[in-house]
Amino acid sequence: MEPSGLRTPCSLLALVLLSALVLTPTLAIEVYTDREVYGTAGSRVTLSCSFWSSEWISDDISVTWHYQPDHSREMYSIVHFAKGLSSIDAGIFKDRIEWVGSPKWKDASIVVHNLELTDNGTFTCDVKNPPDVVGKSSYVHLQVQEKGPARAGLILGIIIAVALALVIVVTILILLIRYCWLRRKARVQRELSALERGKLHKAKDSSKRSSRQTPILYAMLDQTRGKSSEKKAKGGIGDSRKDRK
């Protein structure tokens, strides 16, 4: 038999190792969804869900979606995925939910078709990937609004049309103003050019007239001088005749 003193340290060592293995912290699986998603009645909406796990994606991975209507405390299971197969639970979403996730790509999304106003509520995505099963679920709130895309589109189209019409009108006015201004400017320039040409023409005519009138004036002066000299000559002859008498 072994002494009891030797068995005690071995037992303590084994206990410590076992405790270390059991108490070693493991990373919890993390699940991500949007916090709020909006949809319109009659359309469809995708509720995205992704996750991160410290373990390899195993064949035992499972995904469960729950739904809790607004103003209600009851929660319903609506989608379940396990062993590579998805199943839609009976309920208000029986024929309107589609599994579109791919766990190997860490995707656990679903699509809700033909939305109704009564679908407002909270959808919870829960993922388990053994042995990584510790973690919190993630939730997304769905808000379904009344169908109004046609009216909204009509209003938006009217606004865009009015804006374009205003832009076109303003552009035409600017072009007209610019055209009138350029035309007026060209007319003023033509008038100024005509005035300048008229002034030059008048100056030339006046210079020609002055040049023509100068010889005439000289001729008239010469004639006047000739006549005065003739008168003086005649006057002198008459005086001489008087003296002779």
Curated annotation (Swiss-Prot):
Residues in the Extracellular compartment per record: 29-153
Top-rank lineage group of the source organism: Eukaryota
PROSITE patterns found in the cross-reference section: IG_LIKE
Pfam families: Myelin-PO_C, V-set
InterPro entries attached to this UniProt entry: Ig-like_dom, Ig-like_dom_sf, Ig-like_fold, Ig_sub, Ig_V-set, Myelin_P0-rel, Myelin_P0_Ig-like, MYP0_C
Membrane topology note: Single-pass type I membrane protein
TM region(s), chain numbering: 154-174
Sequence ranges assigned to domain Ig-like V-type in this UniProt record: 29-143
Membrane topology, Cytoplasmic segments: 175-245
Stored Gene3D superfamilies: Immunoglobulins
Start and end residues of each stretch annotated as Disordered: 199-245
Keyword Zinc in annotation: no
List of glycosylated residues: 120
SUPFAM superfamilies: Immunoglobulin
Protein keywords: Cell membrane, Disulfide bond, Glycoprotein, Immunoglobulin domain, Membrane, Signal, Transmembrane, Transmembrane helix
Principal location: membrane
SS bond partners: 49-125
Span of the signal peptide: 1-28
GO process terms (BP): cell-cell adhesion via plasma-membrane adhesion molecules; myelination
Subcellular localization(s) per the UniProt record: Cell membrane
Sequence ranges of Basic and acidic residues compositional bias: 199-208, 224-245
Keyword Transmembrane: yes
Functional note: Creation of an extracellular membrane face which guides the wrapping process and ultimately compacts adjacent lamellae.
UniProt similarity note: Belongs to the myelin P0 protein family.
Protein name as annotated: Myelin protein P0
